[in-house]
Amino acid sequence: MIIELDEFTRVEGNGKAEIVIENGEVKDARVKIVEGPRFFEILTLGRDYWDVPDLEARICAICYIAHSVASVRAIEKALGIDVPESVEKLRELALWGEIIESHALHLYLLALPDVFGYPDAISMIPRHGELVKEGLTIKAFGNAIRELIGGREIHGINIKPGGFGRYPSEEELEKIAEHSKSLIKFARRIVGIFASQEAGGAVGEVLMATSDYLWGDELIINGERVQYYEVDEVPVGYSFAKHSYYKGNPVFVGALPRLLLKGESIEGEAARMLEEYRDKLESKYVIYNNLAQAIELLYALERVPQLVEEILSEGIERGNGEISQESGEGVGYVEAPRGVLVHHYRIENGKVVWSNTITPTAFNQRLMELSLLEEAKRLYGSESEENMKKRLEVIVRAFDPCISCSVHFVKL
């Protein structure tokens, strides 16, 4: 017998799952990423390196900054492009803006209805309208940062190898800093709400993140420093996304692995919240990825004013994007809101000849299946099929999957 979750709701993209029942016992769980492959690597082949980040920004509207930054970092390594410190800090600001936008969308509009027992955020408005309004306000602020640095709210084209097409003014940055301070109280409230959520899903034993908080030159897996090609990618016949394993174990990426592997990097009230809820987070239940996102949202709002002050006090040096070689190979590691994102290029005479991208949801797919399997085993026979399906979707949503991103890498 197969119990089908016909379509995941309140997630980005199209996916479904099957729970396999044999002789009255739960035997398997399969997550089917059914959204069609998009072949973004193919689109980059033969393209001038300068055009590639703008193409990669089209992979996802929600996390285009991460794709753009990972792309330019890979190109800069391949072609020996120097990047001023102020450019790096403006990119960091853009990434925090994206985390603010994406986490607000997920927490307030997609995951919060699960906490309060509603089918969707619209149904919450009569009793929890202020929370919905706060979430939309925070999301709009994150988009304002993305528009300022990336050029557009979605699919921006301002992030370039070595720098930017347009640089923000001092007045624009100061406005962003002040606005961020006014939103901290909202994020503080949402942390407490998600701390009350019931644990569930599999335990993510193999945690993976970039070596620095938002990017790095290598990955950290349970404290061990590795390169992405040491993680095995395995195609599966029922899904357009591969499974990822490290030494035979599924990996887990996202806000929870970031906080557990690199939580010493955060400061302020978010750091105190991290310590207060550390026991929950260290249980590594995937459901607490929501709590981790809430803490990270708080930190992002605290970090933005600090970062703006650093940028303005040091001054903005504009990068020129000058290359030192026309051929080379580079890997860009960036933390997208949902976890580790990899862009890898080989460039010859200024043209991309080989391209590979791995997204957070692709890394997480196998652990998502194991989480559904564990939860189905716990609930089958004691809950109605309808209630079990609802709970399984709660587990899926905790991963905050971006399914449109996950299918782009299937190759012809």
UniProtKB/Swiss-Prot annotation:
Record Gene3D superfamilies: Cytochrome-c3 Hydrogenase, chain B
Domain of life: Archaea
Reaction(s) this enzyme catalyzes, per UniProt: H2 + NADP(+) = NADPH + H(+); H2 + NAD(+) = NADH + H(+)
Cofactor(s) named in the record: Ni(2+); Fe cation
Entry's pH dependence statement: Optimum pH is 8 for hydrogenase activity at >95 degrees Celsius.
Enzyme Commission number(s) of this protein: 1.12.1.5
Residues binding Fe cation: C63, C405
Cellular component GO terms held in the UniProt record: cytoplasm
Thermal activity characteristics from the UniProt entry: Optimum temperature is greater than 90 degrees Celsius. Activity increases with increasing temperature from 30 degrees Celsius to 90 degrees Celsius. Has a half-life of 6 hours at 95 degrees Celsius.
Broad class of where this protein is predominantly found: cytoplasm
InterPro entries: Hydrogenase_lg_subunit, Ni-dep_hyd_lsu, Ni-dep_hyd_lsu_Ni_BS, NiFe-Hase_large
Cofactor annotation comment: Binds 1 nickel ion per subunit.
MF GO annotations: ferredoxin hydrogenase activity; hydrogen dehydrogenase (NADP+) activity; hydrogen dehydrogenase activity; nickel cation binding
Compartment(s): Cytoplasm
Keyword Oxidoreductase: yes
Pfam families from the UniProt entry: NiFeSe_Hases
Family membership: Belongs to the [NiFe]/[NiFeSe] hydrogenase large subunit family.
Function (record text): Part of a bifunctional enzyme complex that functions as a hydrogen-evolving hydrogenase with sulfur-reducing activity. May play a role in hydrogen cycling during fermentative growth. Activity exhibited with NAD in addition to NADPH. The alpha and delta subunits form the hydrogenase component that catalyzes the reduction of protons to evolve hydrogen.
Assembly and binders: Dimer of heterotetramer of alpha, beta, gamma and delta subunits. The nickel-containing alpha and delta subunits constitute the hydrogenase activity. The beta and gamma subunits (flavin-containing dimer) constitute the sulfur reductase activity.
Protein name from the UniProt record: Sulfhydrogenase 2 subunit alpha
Organism: Pyrococcus furiosus (strain ATCC 43587 / DSM 3638 / JCM 8422 / Vc1)
Taxonomic path: Archaea, Methanobacteriati, Methanobacteriota, Thermococci, Thermococcales
Gene this protein is translated from: shyA
